[in-house]
A protein has these predicted regions:
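Beta-strand-loop-alpha-helix segment that lines the small-molecule cofactor/substrate pocket
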Residues: 1-34, 48, 294
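Aromatic/hydrophobic pocket-lining residues that form π-stacking "cages" and hydrophobic walls in ligand
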Residues: 15, 41, 285
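Structural detector of well-ordered beta-strand residues that form the stable sheet scaffold
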Residues: 25-27, 57, 218
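Short, solvent-exposed turn/loop segments enriched in Gly/Ser/Thr/Pro and often Arg
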Residues: 5-12, 31-35, 60-62, 222-224, ...
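Rossmann-like NAD(P)H-binding beta-loop-alpha module
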Residues: 37-93
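Tryptophan-rich aromatic "cage" segments
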Residues: 313-326
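Active-site-proximal cap/loop segments of hydrolase catalytic domains
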Residues: 9-12, 18-20, 38, 66, ...
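Glycine-rich, aromatic-lined ligand/substrate-binding cores of catalytic
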Residues: 81-82, 86-272, 280-288, 292-302, ...
Length: 326
């Protein structure tokens, strides 16, 4: 199943429970989770290369950076009703959401911008870019989330995601590991340039900075690609630890096929719904914070609710049109 796994937090929780109950082999399409780099990152952090990690900054240039839906969020809701392509079952494509007539401003691809169908830049790319820190640091569920954003364009206010946003998560301590503050930036907003980065070096268009008491790591999108300690001298000096995490042999898709062939008692795929569901929940909680904006949301993971914001609670799921249930 592609990332994000679901449209709503409730759906992510339910589909994870269903996969667990029926004991089936599953895989979410965050292919970086099968990479070598993400395993190296987890091993290096376990080795103490950064010391206790307290801060993460992650960003994407989307929805501005060259995407087919990059300029769409400023347009008005389409009013004309062109014919549905012969190759498309529009009713099935809509699934459980409220009916709207077909329009190419929704599909293909541009659906990501619309609240009806998509989850914005954070839902689109968070399961790639936040994956390394979420896994390597065993972050689990946040206890607070808050967001700020650019304004919505007048013609689509409350219908699309904003051009750019910043989301701040706080994750509680995990055993001896300290709390972590994770900040997400999209729409070409960026974190401050690390002072350890040498002159002439720049941050990637999408990626993350992981900050510990003993140093920093920068990586790109999709499974901590192009991971480097900074400054570069630290990268050259670091004595790599032994590789202890099992590697995926072949592709992300091939790993799922391998799991299916092994059957119910086999080794799960690298990003099974047990993991992918939790990662999706984290990303979609940030999406809700963007929609309520400028509110500190306190999250109760076990109860599946925000303890201090009824409006945010309503966004955990959507009404389904007749014929669809979960």
């Amino acid at each position: 199943c592609q990332k994000p796994l679901t449209h709503t937090v409730y759906e992510a929780r339910e589909i994870t429970k269903a996969a667990r109950y029926y004991n089936v082999q599953t895989q979410m399409g965050n292919q970086g989770h099968s990479s070598e780099h993400i395993r190296l990152l987890k091993e290096w952090l376990a080795d103490g290369v950064l010391g206790p990690v307290t801060e993460v900054h992650a960003w994407t240039d989307r929805p501005v950076g060259g995407d087919p839906w990059s300029t769409f969020a400023v347009q008005a809701r389409p009013q004309d009703t062109p014919p549905v392509p012969e190759t498309l079952n529009w009713d099935l494509w809509l699934g459980p959401v409220a009916y709207r007539p077909y329009h190419p401003d929704y599909h293909p691809m541009k659906w990501r911008a619309w609240l009806d169908f998509g989850t914005g830049a954070l839902g689109d790319m968070g399961c790639h870019i936040l994956d390394p820190a979420f896994w390597a640091l065993d972050l689990g569920a946040p206890d607070t989330i808050e967001a700020t954003s650019t304004h919505w364009e007048e013609n689509v206010a409350g219908q699309t995601f904003p051009r750019a946003s910043i989301v701040r998560y706080r994750f509680p301590a995990r055993g001896e590991r300290p709390p972590v503050k994770l900040t997400w930036y999209d729409g070409r907003l960026m974190p401050p340039m690390p002072e350890e980065l040498e002159p002439g070096r720049t941050l990637p268009d999408s990626g993350a900075i992981i900050i510990g008491k003993k140093g920093k790591i920068i990586h790109g999108s999709h499974g901590a690609g192009s991971m480097r300690l900074i400054p570069e001298s630290r990268m050259q000096e670091y004595k790599r630890p032994e590789k202890t995490i099992p590697r995926v042999l072949g592709s992300h898709e091939g790993d799922w096929i391998r799991a299916c062939k092994e059957g119910r008692n086999g080794t799960p795929a690298s990003s099974s719904f047990e993991y992918g569901g939790a990662l999706t929940e984290m990303a979609l909680l940030g999406m809700i914070a963007i929609r309520v904006k400028n509110q500190i949301l306190r999250w109760d993971h076990d109860a599946l609710r925000f303890v201090n914001n009824a409006k945010a609670d309503e966004l955990l799921h959507i009404p389904y049109r007749p014929g669809w249930t979960l």
